[in-house]
Amino acid sequence: LVMNTLLATGDAPLSAGFLAWRAMCADKPDFDVGRLLGRGNPHLGVDECAAYDAPFPDDTYKAGARVFPTLVPISTDYASAQENIEAWKSLRKFDKPFLTAFSDSDPVTAGGERYFQREIPGCAGQAHTTIVNASHFLQEDAGEEFADVVNKFVASTK
């Protein structure tokens, strides 16, 4: 099961939303993780946003979060491009049940589910889902609905 993700190989352009997120992570002086999550999930309360901040007591702990987007290959020159190409070679042979559950309002990964569905044999015949009125973090935007999707998928594979 994949949700709101991509496995870039550097040979196709990434979305404007992804590139904006990448630039923001690199350039924004006040990199407040809780506030970032709160902007995309306005229903999160102060305590929930604070919980997302908890692993980052100061900026030195945020290096991984800042660097993470730069690991996604934007050209085939990236080391991770070759790793992802190899992963796709395996996924293109994967014939076990494979489900996509994406949201309708994620500016970074919108439409990415179609590639997974087209390329992975195990996607055939699955109850792929687009969760409506949800953004990138499905567990926050539509936690119960997403859990129901996962539970039904697991039950269908027994």
Where are these regions (language model features)?
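Flexible "cap/lid" subdomain of the alpha/beta-hydrolase fold that forms the substrate-access gate
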Residues: 1-132, 139, 153-157
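Catalytic histidine-centered segment of alpha/beta-hydrolase-like enzymes
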Residues: 134-147
